[in-house]
A protein has these predicted regions:
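A conserved beta-strand-loop-helix scaffold within acyl/acetyltransferase catalytic domains
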Residues: 40, 78-83
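Basic/polar N-terminal segments that are highly enriched at the extreme N-terminus
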Residues: 1-10
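A short beta-loop-alpha structural element at the N-terminal edge
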Residues: 11-25, 80
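Short strand-connecting beta-turns/loops that link adjacent beta-strands
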Residues: 17-18, 69-71
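Conserved acyl-donor/pantetheine-binding loop and adjacent beta-alpha core of acyl/acetyltransferases
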Residues: 82-122
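Helix-loop element at the rim of GNAT/NAT acetyltransferase active sites that forms part
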Residues: 14, 25-41, 54-55
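Active-site rim helix/loop that mediates acceptor-substrate recognition in acyltransferases
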Residues: 41-63, 69
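Conserved beta-strand in the GNAT
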Residues: 65, 71-80
Length: 122
């Protein structure tokens, strides 16, 4: 699908592995109800590691990007089935994250801790 208006042409296309960084950038720039989250957490990758990366890694066939002709500037991601996705998330995605993030040993207090709680308890 191609979207066009004066000065802007973009198309929706299937996600490609080379889009990973651009999708992460979009998530960082829009992760707070359309506002950016850069510098808000201890790492800018926190939100995309929770809300974009697992879908790109586990189910890339259910990911699409809005491409402006230079790079992905938007995305839509999904899963074929939540129970299977959650199982794969726990078995294949979480082990990759444990090198950078640690589960909480107490109830979450800060906004970042609440995000980590979501990460480790999908």
């Amino acid at each position: 699908m191609t979207l066009s208006r004066p000065g802007l042409t973009a198309k929706i296309r299937p996600y490609r592995a080379g889009d990973w960084a651009a999708v992460y950038d979009v998530c960082i720039e829009t992760g707070n109800a359309g506002q950016g989250v850069r510098g808000r957490y201890s790492t800018d990758d926190l939100l995309p590691d929770i809300f974009a990366g697992p879908y790109l890694y586990l189910e890339p066939g259910h990911a699409y990007v809005l491409d402006n002709g230079e790079r992905a500037v938007g995305y839509i991601i999904g899963t074929a089935g939540t129970p299977d996705f959650v199982a794969a998330y726990e078995e294949r995605w979480l082990p990759r994250l444990r090198t950078r993030y640690q589960p909480l040993s107490r109830p979450p207090v800060t906004e970042e801790e609440h995000r980590l709680d979501v990460m480790f308890h999908p």
